[in-house]
């Protein structure tokens, strides 16, 4: 069976790397990889693929920039051309990006079956572009590979049991990736802090595009640096520019954006993770670190339920107090919430039996 995999963001490459390895092990499966170009940066170079052992894409569409509609529309057109040329038996998409939706829509309109990895996730916040993407992708997919029990419950609540789609609980491929690459972790350049620091990330538009929320978060980070523990903040130039334009000053240790292997290194040595990233919430759990999430909702409600994650929004006092009480807390994956690192093999084995 020929599988056409659509990816466009760096996290999707990292997830796809372990699934592609599992697909190769199945003699009845072959894979064509399409990179839409949604996340365009220097780190998506040949060195990036070699460092992580990620298969190089068969197609590079180089589509990035513009509005959500412009980007998705251009992707839809070019992915359709690839599907018509390659004639795959199935299209495989990951997560909730514009690349995900474009790949799913292109396949659906050409009547090619779709498998969605990370299906069933919901933040219940329709202002998030990702929420729209994941809901629409689930609707047109016929195999829904869910990472958690909560994701399956979400699909059941939306009536998917009455549809022809197959719902499969495989676990989370992000855990597979984290465990696989943990031994390759490398330290970032210019880090001055000792182990036990607080690792912070800040990039989500709901925080960086809202001056009130961003000001509150910056003030909280500065207070934590002074009164709780040293804070290490890998920061994208765009976010740094927004902070400077608001006249705010960060007192924490700001470092340049880091790659995946450097991020794992930081996670392994931190005492707490403070983030607004969906993926980093889980990665903190994979490495046994408590997490404080600066968002009003999360797709990973099971982490809040089990006490590994605290949702605090952007309120300064809540961020500071939660950081103080969570720092150094022991987190154990007793229940194997995310499949224990076997999701990719389960996905490949399921596809091979079709």
From Swiss-Prot:
Q: How does activity depend on temperature?
A: Optimum temperature is 30-37 degrees Celsius.
Q: Gene3D superfamilies given for it?
A: Glycogen Phosphorylase B
Describe which pathway this protein belongs to, using the record's wording.
Bacterial outer membrane biogenesis; LPS O-antigen biosynthesis
Keywords, sorted A to Z: Cell wall biogenesis/degradation, Isomerase, Lipopolysaccharide biosynthesis
EC number from the UniProt entry: 5.1.3.23
Q: Which GO terms describe its molecular function?
A: UDP-glucuronate 4-epimerase activity; UDP-N-acetylglucosamine 2-epimerase activity
One GO term under biological process is: O antigen biosynthetic process
pH-dependence of activity, as noted: Optimum pH is 6.0.
Q: Which reaction does it catalyse?
A: UDP-2,3-diacetamido-2,3-dideoxy-alpha-D-glucuronate = UDP-2,3-diacetamido-2,3-dideoxy-alpha-D-mannuronate
Q: Look at the named UniProt entry and state the broad enzyme category this protein falls under.
A: isomerase
Where does the record locate the signal sequence feature?
none
Q: Which family does it belong to?
A: Belongs to the UDP-N-acetylglucosamine 2-epimerase family.
List the NCBIfam families.
wecB
Q: What does this protein do?
A: Plays a role in the biosynthesis of B-band O antigen for serotype O5. Catalyzes the epimerization of UDP-2,3-diacetamido-2,3-dideoxy-alpha-D-glucuronic acid (UDP-alpha-D-GlcNAc3NAcA) to UDP-2,3-diacetamido-2,3-dideoxy-alpha-D-mannuronic acid (UDP-alpha-D-ManNAc3NAcA). Exhibits high specificity towards the substrate as UDP-alpha-D-GlcNAc, UDP-alpha-D-GlcNAcA (UDP-2-acetamido-2-deoxy-alpha-D-glucuronic acid) and UDP-alpha-D-GlcNAc3NAc (UDP-2,3-diacetamido-2,3-dideoxy-alpha-D-glucose) cannot act as substrates.
Name of the molecule in the record: UDP-2,3-diacetamido-2,3-dideoxy-D-glucuronate 2-epimerase
Organism field:
Pseudomonas aeruginosa (strain ATCC 15692 / DSM 22644 / CIP 104116 / JCM 14847 / LMG 12228 / 1C / PRS 101 / PAO1)
Gene coding for it: wbpI
């Amino acid at each position: 069976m020929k599988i056409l995999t659509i990816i466009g963001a760096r996290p999707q490459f990292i997830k796809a790397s372990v699934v592609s390895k599992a697909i190769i092990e199945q003699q009845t499966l072959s894979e064509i990889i399409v990179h839409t170009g949604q996340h365009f940066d220097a780190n998506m170079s040949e060195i990036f693929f070699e460092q992580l052992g990620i298969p190089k894409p068969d197609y590079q569409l180089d589509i990035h920039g513009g509005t959500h509609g412009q980007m998705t529309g251009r992707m839809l057109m070019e992915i359709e051309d690839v599907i018509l040329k390659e004639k795959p038996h199935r299209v495989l998409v990951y997560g909730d990006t514009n690349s995900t939706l474009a790949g799913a829509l292109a396949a659906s309109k050409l009547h090619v079956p779709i498998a969605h990895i990370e299906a069933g996730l919901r933040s219940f916040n329709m202002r998030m572009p990702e929420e729209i993407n994941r809901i629409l992708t689930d609707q047109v997919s016929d195999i829904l590979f869910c990472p958690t029990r909560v994701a399956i419950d979400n699909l059941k609540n939306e009536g998917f049991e009455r549809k022809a789609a197959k719902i499969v609980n495989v676990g989370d491929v992000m855990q597979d990736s984290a465990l696989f690459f943990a031994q390759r972790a490398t330290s970032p350049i210019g880090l001055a802090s000792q182990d036990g620091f607080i690792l912070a990330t800040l990039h989500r538009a709901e925080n960086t595009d809202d001056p009130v929320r961003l000001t509150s978060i910056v003030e909280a980070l500065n207070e934590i640096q002074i009164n709780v523990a040293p804070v290490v903040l890998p920061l994208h130039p765009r976010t740094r520019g927004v902070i400077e334009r608001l006249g705010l000053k960060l007192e924490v240790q700001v470092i340049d954006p880091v790659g995946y292997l450097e991020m794992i290194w930081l996670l392994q040595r931190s005492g707490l993770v403070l983030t607004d990233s969906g993926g980093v919430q889980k990665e903190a759990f994979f490495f046994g670190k408590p997490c404080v999430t600066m968002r009003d909702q999360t797709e990973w409600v099971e982490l809040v339920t089990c006490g590994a994650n605290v949702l605090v929004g952007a309120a300064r006092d809540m961020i500071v107090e939660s950081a103080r009480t969570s720092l150094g807390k022991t987190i154990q994956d007793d229940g194997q919430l995310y499949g224990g690192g076997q999701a990719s093999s389960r996905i490949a084995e399921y596809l091979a039996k079709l």
